[in-house]
């Protein structure tokens, strides 16, 4: 187990219930969204850090070209959803913690209602509508058909490579209709056989939702397509780790598909861990897929913590 998981409420209890002389652990993703890495640092302080440049120099990992692919779609529906989301969020002072507590904690809900001169019933109704709007907006972003279209375009241009896709849902992964899909609905033996067969292949496509984000070593992967963006640097590092296994002469490619001018841009900004090349048109994407150089541009991101939602 990578040690970043030891900061959870369940696993962190082991620090006080297990007798040990010293702890030695390793992770590529110490930082957590909830800030609980301080627990790990307390019991197992960081004694050494290996930089990416050091790993590349020692040929422990392969270089990766990171592409941010901006998808331009009709945002009429998104703007309507975003307007609803913001109207409900304003009721909770644009504070995620307040909104979630109002939804889940009746004592907090009663207290907050009293503070703002409302009723617990009204506060709960606003919180429920806020959550509904949040999920609707996220669904628009995550499951937009443009992502499937562009994903297929990339896969069709890399038929001679071993590719992996990171999808928001199993249903989304299956709708790509390229290669094979791993998911919890299949028997463990079926998923294992699929990975074994893929390891022995020279090219192909492996689709998954979260099953392959971490803890899996798959041979020969050199192309990744990420379509399940959130604000977590852990997820970004783990998915990149799937394709950067060292092989002589290999340069891997990671394509991150993002709906332009939406909250997904901010999620990408919060989760990004490396330099990237911006692809803001299908013409530029075609050039990249033909191994041509393109001119990239810079984007100013707002990486405020509250923008992770």
Q: For each of these PLM feature ranges, what is it?
A:
Residues 104-108, 113-115, 277-309:
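Long, largely alpha-helical accessory region at the distal end of helicase-like NTP-driven motors
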Residues 242-272:
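Conserved segment of the helicase C-terminal RecA-like domain
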Residues 1-4, 211-212, 228-230, 243:
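Conserved Walker B
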Residues 5-7, 32-33, 215, 233, ...:
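Catalytic P-loop NTPase motifs of RecA-like helicase/translocase cores
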Residues 22, 204-205, 223:
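Short, Asp-centered acidic motifs that coordinate Mg2+ and/or phosphate
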Residues 4-66:
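Post-DEXD/H (motif II) to motif III coupling segment of the RecA-like Helicase ATP-binding lobe
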Residues 46-161:
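Conserved interdomain linker/interface between the two RecA-like ATPase lobes of SF2 helicase motors
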